[in-house]
């Protein structure tokens, strides 16, 4: 996609109150085999109130291609990513989250895939951090079927996405109003504009599982809100608000799990509960939408 075998890449990493996560991610990013002079790493601090910014500054002092960027005005990952886009100098934007890590060849492998498409989703594997809890095992079963997302829903999650500057200049950045689902909304714009989307199975990123009930609930509430918001803002593409989210199916533990029958029962119950939590998030947002349209 460029004359140089190594196009300039801007790696954009939104972060909020996660010093450990951003340290792990920046450590992995600064060890990439991709030529250092062709990469600028942009951790975007989204108003952290802990030592997150201090951790980033330490990397900034030690690595000339790491630059701290601050987004204090709007709290939200899509606003942070858009600020990163504004500050980026690369021909390619690579998006990862601030609790992920990757092998040293990840960026080189991912950029190679850009020869075939202007929008590339990376492989994402969920990993445990030593906590063998029911929520961790449950979350691990969700996985990230990126190839299916791209083929059927025309998007890749922003925690593992590469996209050319040309595409963003054409279709616009992320919608900062969305609390979730901005990756889906952006991906549909890219597809509608006629750009090819591809999956890079060899470009693997590692994402920690959610290992507590509270983290699962927080995620599902946010996803439910995002479903309704996409319908509110983009009814032509996502339908009108008021249609509840459909259950994604009962998850089952893998065949290697001990106590399989009992665990399958627990997974089934938890699947139903989390679908209900997602619906709760959806209808909370729907009530806000209705009230806003009846004033």
Curated annotation (Swiss-Prot):
Traits of the deletion mutant: Mutants contain only mono- and disaccharide-modified phosphodolichols and exhibit defective or limited motility.
Pathway: Cell surface structure biogenesis; S-layer biogenesis
InterPro entries given in the database record: Glyco_trans_2-like (IPR001173), Glycosyltransf_2 (IPR050834), Nucleotide-diphossugar_trans (IPR029044)
Organism superkingdom: Archaea
Membrane topology qualifier: Single-pass membrane protein
GO terms for biological process, alphabetical: S-layer organization
GO cellular component, one term: plasma membrane
Transmembrane domains' residue ranges: 265-283
Keywords, ordered alphabetically: Cell membrane, Glycosyltransferase, Membrane, Transferase, Transmembrane, Transmembrane helix
Record-listed E.C. numbers: 2.4.1.-
Function: Involved in the assembly of a N-linked pentasaccharide that decorates the S-layer glycoprotein and flagellins. Catalyzes the addition to the dolichol phosphate carrier of the hexuronic acid found at position 3 of the pentasaccharide.
Protein name per Swiss-Prot or TrEMBL: Glycosyltransferase AglI
Source organism phylogeny: Archaea, Methanobacteriati, Methanobacteriota, Stenosarchaea group, Halobacteria
